[in-house]
Amino acid sequence: MTTDHRTTALLLFSAFVAVTLIITTWVSRHRQGSAEEFYTGNRLFSPMENGFAIAGDYMSAASFLGISGLIALVGYDGMLYSVGFLVAWLVVLFLVAELVRNCGRFTLADVVAARMRERPVRIAAGTSSVAVSVLYLVAQMVGAGSLVALLLGGTGEAVQAWTVVGVGALMVIYVSLGGMRATTWIQIVKAVLLLGGTITLTVLVLLRFHGDVNRLLHTAAERSGHGDAFLAPGLAYGGDWTARFDFISLGLALVLGTAGLPHILSRFYTVPTARAARRSVVWAIGLIGGFYLMTIVLGFGAAALIGPDAVRASHASGNTAVPLLALDLGGGAGTTGGTVLFAVVAAVAFATILAVVAGITLASSASVAHDLYASLRRSGGKPRSEVAVARVAAVGIGIVAIALGLLARDLNVAFLVGLAFAVAASANLPVLLYSLFWRGFTTRGAVWSVYGGLIPAVVLVLLSPVVSGSPDSLFPGVDFQLFPLQNPGLVSIPLGFLAGWLGTVTSTEVPDEARHAETEVRSLTGAGAA
């Protein structure tokens, strides 16, 4: 792009940041002193508003940039992410949404601790929630670095590094000043912008091929260099048995992980009733379903119009496929139309990243303040306000996410989110389901379930090809790879469920029938819910 066009792009790109900071500043003038206000916005959002906010929270950089990029590079196999992310919401709708809204108050640990000894359960669940959130944040940081480096016309490490630092600083400002109310409105605005941008690009791609989807697919296959194999399963996950098991592992993580994501669970506390929570999910499924169908068109459109080689040359993992597609659809590099469309898409993608990191940071800082701090602080001293602790925690989590984002900047963002989903499905989902549905579940079972899924998931990732042993690893110069799969879900998810069962059957604790009955009635009817 020319200097003038880059200036235009940067002005459009900066507009959303300005709008979101105005929203945050306006909200910060309202009283944010109570935990209820800071964590849930006083539960004043309607099902439609919360549905748009959930969609805004869920349609992350992994969805917009990563999935389309993977489809552009590996075709059919990249669609697994689109299908997995969408199907996961059926688990949320039928098993989690209403029950979590009725049983909890602010965090996942509230649901589990309702019938267990609070301290060990809150420490375990809080630790797990922070681990999942940080992994998810890293993916958003990587997406931001790739996007802004492309926007500025450079792919140097310094540009990406400063972008990651800038995103981290913005997310801390959003959460510290605005809390849930500002975060929710940022997510709603972002969801509208993202859907509008995605619809526009999808229509332009289909118009380029005169509405002939068959022609679009065959053109993508021809330019891919793989022929019809580009449109069939197996290009990425069918080479050998290890790849096939990786396929199964990733599918399990995507389908089961959503119900264990802390920032998604926290959204159910922002509506007044369980019925509103369920209606929120219905709204979210409609919005998210339409979006993921369009990412498939964008992925194959990038393969057909840009070509996998050009996408890979811009970013090895395909994270810049959609911005490059927008540039081409608008008229190409050097044209005003191409630059404006590119800048709009870049601004929308950046809005996506900012909104998601704000939601994740709020959820993880809530876990630190409401679960970890409240459980670990020494008695006798003057306790600090939960909200004050949450604001400090947001800063600490931001620093950790920035550091890891700098380390992982060359990985595909959809792939990174797949790892976060695997940890969520391994550590959070088993304890959540056992707490809601198993009458005999005990405190030991809850603690073992969390750590029995969390520790294996993290250790297997560290020992996988993601970290070492291959040219695409985080540390390509060393090799301590012992686990062959890139996603640990196939092993760590069953281990989480097994550990919860084993901890319960070996526990000498007698399950509290009265508290279980109370939790069951509350989860099903909403009686006594906050």
Whereabouts are the PLM-identified features?
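Structural signal for membrane-spanning alpha-helices in multi-pass inner-membrane proteins
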Residues: 20-27, 92-96, 171, 175, ...
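Loop-to-helix junctions at membrane interfaces in multi-pass transport proteins
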Residues: 2-6, 42-45, 66-80, 159-160, ...
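Alpha-helical transmembrane segments
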Residues: 5-18, 81-92, 244-253, 347-354, ...
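Helix-loop-helix junctions that connect adjacent transmembrane helices in secondary transporters/permeases
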Residues: 67-177, 267-418, 527-530
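Hydrophobic cores of alpha-helical transmembrane segments in multi-pass inner/ER membrane proteins
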Residues: 87-94, 427-432, 436, 492-503
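A generic transmembrane alpha-helix motif of multi-pass inner-membrane proteins
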Residues: 2-24, 246, 444-530
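Short, Lys/Arg-enriched, Gly/Pro-containing loop segments at transmembrane-helix junctions
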Residues: 32-38, 110, 213-218, 414-417, ...
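Membrane-interface loop-to-helix entry segments
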Residues: 5-36, 106-149, 162-222, 256-263, ...
